[in-house]
A protein has these predicted regions:
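Domain-level signal for Mg2+-assisted phosphodiester chemistry and nucleotide/NA-binding surfaces
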Residues: 2-110, 150
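Low-complexity, prion-like intrinsically disordered regions of RNA granule-associated mRNA regulation factors
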Residues: 2-19, 195-236
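General structural signal for secondary-structure boundaries
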Residues: 50, 175-178, 227
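Nuclease catalytic cores that cleave nucleic-acid phosphodiester bonds
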Residues: 75-210, 214, 233-235
Length: 236
């Protein structure tokens, strides 16, 4: 499948949402979410996702094959476990494994699981919507495109690999399609699966921890190019 060379990101949120809707309309779409990558980028940029709203949007706009959420978890984190249970109730398929704790780090990379599923399920979908800015998935995208699949990357601006951005057929900034995942609320009470109350408190499983390193929403990151590699806190 040839890339859509004429695609240009619209200037406003409504146009960008409409463009994504037009791309996936009535198509067989598989949505894969790299939770660790999504968590880190959205926590730093203070984007809070209503996952229930996002699932409902995709289910209405396309022939949704599945929405698969890849994450490592801490079985002792009550709030994280409740969050994951709510995701499952909302229709998400969880692919998860417990984190591994070492003397100076916590590890829980799910890249291999995501890539294997994307390949094993290739006959079931026409479009793959990947929620991740991780450049490690560039090779996966190249392989799927050779097999005729259309790849959409949805990630946070400034936290996306340049190679991943360039390889995908279409790229959408998460903060430019907010009507998909954010429902206006009259109160601060969450109705459904809202990352504002739960996700920012969950430790990203792929972040290396030591006594000198602490990643918070106030972390200042170096700015080089408008689209740059994700800071190297995610480990293989």
């Amino acid at each position: 499948m040839e890339k859509n060379q004429s695609f240009k990101a619209p200037r406003n949120v409504n146009d960008l949402t409409s463009s994504l809707s037009a791309v996936i309309f009535k198509q067989k779409v598989l949505v894969l979410i790299d939770a660790a990558n999504l968590f880190f980028s959205t926590s730093v940029t203070k984007i809070h996702i209503d996952f229930k709203q996002m699932y409902n949007w995709f289910s209405k706009k396309c022939n949704l094959v599945d929405v698969m959420y890849y994450t490592a978890f801490d079985p002792d984190d009550v709030k994280q476990m409740a969050f994951l249970q709510d995701l499952e109730k909302s229709g998400y398929k969880l692919i998860q494994k417990p984190i591994k704790v070492y003397s100076s780090m916590i590890k829980g990379n799910m890249d291999i699981e995501l890539a294997v599923d994307a390949m094993n399920l290739e006959k079931q979908y026409d479009i793959l919507a990947l929620f991740s800015g991780d450049g490690d998935f560039t090779y996966l995208i190249q392989d799927l495109e050779k097999k005729g699949k259309r790849i959409i990357v949805i990630a946070t601006g400034g936290f996306t690999s340049y190679e991943l951005h360039q390889q995908a057929h279409n790229y959408f900034f998460l903060n430019r399609i907010s009507s998909i995942w954010r429902t206006p609320r009259k109160t601060s009470q969450s109705d459904g699966v809202d990352s504002q109350n739960l996700l920012p408190k969950i430790l990203p499983p792929d972040v290396v921890l030591d006594k000198q390193t602490k990643v918070t929403p106030k972390t200042k990151l170096p700015r080089k190019n408008p689209v740059r590699e994700v800071p190297q806190v995610f480990i293989d």
